[in-house]
UniProtKB/Swiss-Prot annotation:
Organism field: Staphylococcus aureus (strain bovine RF122 / ET3-1)
NCBIfam families for this protein: hisC (TIGR01141)
Single Gene Ontology BP annotation: L-histidine biosynthetic process
Protein name: Histidinol-phosphate aminotransferase
Cross-referenced Gene3D superfamilies: Aspartate Aminotransferase, domain 1, Type I PLP-dependent aspartate aminotransferase-like (Major domain)
Record family assignment: Belongs to the class-II pyridoxal-phosphate-dependent aminotransferase family. Histidinol-phosphate aminotransferase subfamily.
Known pathway: Amino-acid biosynthesis; L-histidine biosynthesis; L-histidine from 5-phospho-alpha-D-ribose 1-diphosphate: step 7/9
Swiss-Prot/TrEMBL keywords: Amino-acid biosynthesis, Aminotransferase, Histidine biosynthesis, Pyridoxal phosphate, Transferase
Gene encoding the protein: hisC
Reactions catalysed according to its record: L-histidinol phosphate + 2-oxoglutarate = 3-(imidazol-4-yl)-2-oxopropyl phosphate + L-glutamate
Gene Ontology MF terms in the entry: histidinol-phosphate transaminase activity; pyridoxal phosphate binding
Enzyme Commission number: 2.6.1.9
PANTHER family: HISTIDINOL-PHOSPHATE AMINOTRANSFERASE, HISTIDINOL-PHOSPHATE AMINOTRANSFERASE 2
Spans through the membrane: none
Amino acid sequence: MKEQLNQLSAYQPGLSPRALKEKYGIEGDLYKLASNENLYGPSPKVKEAISAHLDELYYYPETGSPTLKAAISKHLNVDQSRILFGAGLDEVILMISRAVLTPGDTIVTSEATFGQYYHNAIVESANVIQVPLKDGGFDLEGILKQVNEDTSLVWLCNPNNPTGTYFNHESLDSFLSQVPPHVPVIIDEAYFEFVTAEDYPDTLALQQKYDNAFLLRTFSKAYGLAGLRVGYVVASEHAIEKWNIIRPPFNVTRISEYAAVAALEDQQYLKEVTHKNSVERERFYQLPQSKHFLPSQTNFIFVKTKRVNELYEALLNVGCITRPFPTGVRITIGFKEQNDKMLEVLSNFKYE
């Protein structure tokens, strides 16, 4: 076994609603608001697409997901040779890390961001430099100070998980202009569709200026397909050619591909879902207590508090399962009735 695995632990999911009910003696319904899932679910057209192809389950998938690749190519106006799919972004991050990193290499990212950047670097015996957050968000200037000619990968998460904060187009443009052109900069935009900020980066446009800027997106969040695992990277043709060597030949299932195509085609449904999310998100920031909430451009809100366990249990007692972190609690934005319960708790909670 690799010795570096001793530095890591397997992913530990939160307790199930049933287990939480038993642990805390809770009666009534519990709502899972801990994993940033789209509670509205996927487009109805997704279910139609799945039903239409159930007779094909005994076939292997088409390697490389060509139907979905063509759809993404048209949707984003990028060449198909620049797109690579994974079974969720977890696998995409794994493939990139495996293809790029060798023992002793170095990646640079942030503290308090998506853990798979760190996890996969350690698996490959690489070194990890984690720059502290600044005002709850990525400190691009601080990260830039750690990047040099020998850096192997830079990971940026925008908006960031778990804080929900973002950096703007001007900041990313400036950052990319100062990174050595041979150093890959991976921009993880898993929550892109929820963003309403007008100055959010046009990363696809920046890719026209910077060959080392690579973009990650997923169908797990706004498109509501977390259970089907479809994510992708848009990168240079050369990078995709090399990373494709790492990709398992049948990594995205036939059903997942059909579902993702149907979801992508129903942009009206996506707009409805993201609009509902932005309306409900704004309600949290209307509270006087919102000074304790980091500004979010996602479908979740990070609530800062020193009394993490108390807030987690207070929300649990009104039926809402959230995600505790060392410095606060991450809350997935739910339906209005669920948010009403959380808003009442948050409006009466003592944060210090």
